[in-house]
Amino acid sequence: PPSTILAREQRKLPKDLIAISKAIALSRQGKLSKALDQLRIAQGVRPKDPYYQDLYAELLMRNQKFSAAVTAYEKAVAMAPKDSLILAGHGRALLANNQISAALKTLENARSRDFRSTKLLRDLAVAYARSDKPEMAALVTAERFALQGRLKDANIHAKRAVLGLPTGSPAWQKAQDIFSVSTK
């Protein structure tokens, strides 16, 4: 529990790890400001660590500080521009902040680096849906369900995608493949 972590003697740990553990514990107690203060201490020890910045942004997201989270994720992306996890978090923050076009671009970039993240695929489907591209939302949802082994659900969404996408296009072919595999 958070109270145990905050009360524990931690002199043997590095300063940044102590600060990180306190930040997480404080965030679980709903003390965002104090949690962010602890993260700043950790970042002072390791200022170029993109994952400390990612955690900072994630805590902002969990507390619905979407605009601040976007800014924090931009710093993390600057430190690790090819990291799919950080890109996905940035895309999620953009989506939550209603920056749909930027979210779609960022989430597609993240997907090009890691196509197996079901959380990323869920966010990408939402971005497509909010961009008025329901056929692409259906395709990405079908992919996500197929990756999860939920072939019946994948079939439903692949069929929707096949019906809405231009026949013969790469996206249509992918939807057709998922539909074919999921009907067996």
Language-model-derived ranges and their functions:
Residues 1-78, 106, 136, 150, ...:
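Extracytoplasmic and endomembrane cell-envelope/extracellular-matrix remodeling and assembly machinery
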Residues 25, 141-144:
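Generic low-polarity alpha-helical segments
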Residues 40, 50, 54-135, 139:
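Alpha-helical adaptor scaffolds
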Residues 82-88, 92-104, 108, 112, ...:
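Hydrophilic extracytoplasmic domains
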